[in-house]
């Protein structure tokens, strides 16, 4: 069901991995974000809101709460009033559940749309490409909102594997106070102005 919806999105690379990225060739700025363990940290409450928005609350409860968060475990080493503590998933994708990845991938699109709406209200945003947990956004302001939104969801960005225009990258470094970092030019031509951020320990 969700796979069919994504097939109709020209910005989705599930069924053609290069096509959505080819559309962005020639963009002035492109921000490629690599997410850290996105499928493990993607909050179920966000998935619930996405499915509820697309369908209804009852369907969202069945898909997300009953399927994704149905695994309840007893923790024997933590006791609460003479009984074992019970825990369940509040983030991530359960192994073996067929619908978890398509739901996550579609929610990734919706997150980008929401970010774009904050910057360009009333405008259909198409200057991006999504392939599962990988995303390229060809708009500086939308990319900033996306980065902030991920922080709100508790999902981290691997800046060592992300590609960000040098001017924006330097401003991010100055704002965050990250001093233990170096820049290494990748295979991109010098005039592209694109650098890869790598940590010092990773170069050792």
Curated annotation (Swiss-Prot):
InterPro entries according to UniProt: DNA/RNA_pol_sf (IPR043502), RNA_pol_mitovir (IPR008686)
Protein's UniProt keywords contain Thylakoid: no
Main subcellular location of this protein, as a coarse class: mitochondrion
Presence of keyword Nuclease: no
GO cellular component: mitochondrion
Pfam family name, one: Mitovir_RNA_pol
SUPFAM superfamilies, per the entry: DNA/RNA polymerases (SSF56672)
Keywords (A to Z) from UniProt: Mitochondrion
Location in or out of the cell: Mitochondrion
UniProt-recorded name of the protein: Uncharacterized mitochondrial protein AtMg01410
